[in-house]
Structures are given as C-alpha cells and as structure tokens.
Amino acid sequence: MSEEQGAATDGVILDYDVRKVMAALPHRYPLLLVDRVASLTLNERIHAVKAVSMNEQFFQGHFPGRPIMPGVLQIEALAQAAGVLAVESLGLAGSGKLVYFMAIEDAKFRNPVEPGVLLDLHVEFTQKRSRVCKFSGKAMIGDKVTCEVNFTAMIADS
C-alpha cells in the first residue's frame, strides 16, 4: 500500500481523505457523495462519511421548508463507498476500470436525513466473483439507521 492510499495496517486503511476518494472514483461535485473514509478493511468492509450540508443542491427542491436528503442519494452514497471498497480491494486504482451498479434490492428507508449531520456509510462485500460483486449497505446517523440496501456491481472498462 502506498502512502497516497492512506495508512494501512493488516489490510485496514485509515486516514483516507476526499482527495484519495476522488482518485478512486470518477464522481465529482455535485454528485461526489463520499467525503472521507474512516476505515476500510480490504476485501471485507468500509466505513465512509458524508457531511450533509444545507448547501447541497438537492435541498433547494427536496423539500422547501423541510429539507430532506433524497433516499436515492443515500443509496448513491452507499454505492460510491462500495466503489471505493472495490477499487482498493481489487487493486483497480489507475487501471481504467470502473464499478458500475447493476441491481438494487431490498432498499428500505428508516429515518430522514436532514442538513447538518454526518451520514455514516457502512458497506460490506457479501459476494465476489470475477467481475461481479455484491454488497450490503447501511447508512446511519449515530445509532439510527436511515437506509438499508443490497446491491450488485460489475467491474468494467471505462
């Protein structure tokens, strides 16, 4: 693991800031929804964080007077965290490969996400087969689950 990838100990990567997230993902503002990685265990799990600010563009219309982060964007944030997990675990950084999501299953929205919170993004690999990976994700604010989802992704050329 290089210094640029963050501090690594026994397959755990720490100190992974937004610059490193941007090196792993093709997403950019306003659709980059992972601000940092708190921890990543190669081939297992990731805990990423999204700081939800009132300045997010989606709050202008969802909903005026009662801003709530759209559920599909919570799923997208989890998918991006899974993308970072896959890129790091499978050694895809700089390879020209992208993580494309193919299926979303069992999505459940439990609690609203309002401005001013840190949204914790917890994603685990549930299955890996050559170019297809399955994940289970949970978004949380503190100990409250806001969203749960299972999804499938494919590794493909960009």
From Swiss-Prot:
Pfam families: FabA (PF07977)
Any GO BP annotation: lipid A biosynthetic process
Main location: cytoplasm
Keyword Lyase appears in the UniProt entry: yes
Molecular function terms, GO-annotated: (3R)-hydroxyacyl-[acyl-carrier-protein] dehydratase activity
Keywords of this entry: Cytoplasm, Lipid A biosynthesis, Lipid biosynthesis, Lipid metabolism, Lyase
Subcellular locations according to the entry: Cytoplasm
Gene Ontology CC annotation, any one: membrane
Gene3D superfamilies on file: Hotdog Thioesterase (3.10.129.10)
Domain of life: Bacteria
InterPro entries: FabA_FabZ, FabZ, HotDog_dom_sf
Catalytic activity: a (3R)-hydroxyacyl-[ACP] = a (2E)-enoyl-[ACP] + H2O
Tagged with keyword Calcium: no
Catalytic residues (UniProt): H62
EC number: 4.2.1.59
UniProt xrefs under CDD domains: FabZ (cd01288)
Family: Belongs to the thioester dehydratase family. FabZ subfamily.
NCBIfam families reported for this sequence: fabZ (TIGR01750), PRK00006.1 (NF000582)
Described function: Involved in unsaturated fatty acids biosynthesis. Catalyzes the dehydration of short chain beta-hydroxyacyl-ACPs and long chain saturated and unsaturated beta-hydroxyacyl-ACPs.
Name this polypeptide is given: 3-hydroxyacyl-[acyl-carrier-protein] dehydratase FabZ
Native organism: Novosphingobium aromaticivorans (strain ATCC 700278 / DSM 12444 / CCUG 56034 / CIP 105152 / NBRC 16084 / F199)
